[in-house]
Amino acid sequence: MGKHEAPAQEFGYGFRGRMDERYDMVRSVVGKKFIYIRNYMPHKPYGQHVSYMFQTPTTQVWKKMFDEGKLNEAQSHFWKTKPVEELYDLTNDRDEVKNLVKSRQHVDILKKMRKAHLDHVNQIIDVGFLPEGEIHSRSQGTTPYEMARTDKYPFKRIFLAADMASGLSPWATKTLSTYLKDKDS
């Protein structure tokens, strides 16, 4: 505030690494009108089984109705796997129901927000692309922030593999299988 106030940024950035006892990996970019979401574990549903959540009767009934096929598309969304990318117009779709990733009218905003996401994870050297246990073992004697800025964390290689694997493209399988032989895998 005052003379030390920083200028407003074009985007804010979000991070999800876990949901209680479940691991998930989501990054997001939010602007004045749109939110871009990149799911790095799209094979997992939004609604993974979290013990505390399933103690509530409402959640139990909701999941049972989903399993029985009694919900509409919007009601079922939480229990389904995620798309690799999501883009929502927060002005016209506050509930984030209509994913605009495939919309021709939104190609430019998608590219802009995707680039902002990629720039951000590279700028901060996002350590979230390592499992928690690996972050701790590589950071012994230092902090994850400091470890990320050493050769203990080959970020570009790890990020490339994570981005490719989570993209769910069949063409990536051959390349990804060679990564299994990497000395750091």
Question: PLM features: residue spans?
Answer:
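Short secondary-structure boundary segments
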Residues: 1-7, 50-66, 169, 173-177
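Generic preference for hydrophobic/aromatic residues in regular secondary structure cores
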Residues: 12-13, 18, 87, 161, ...
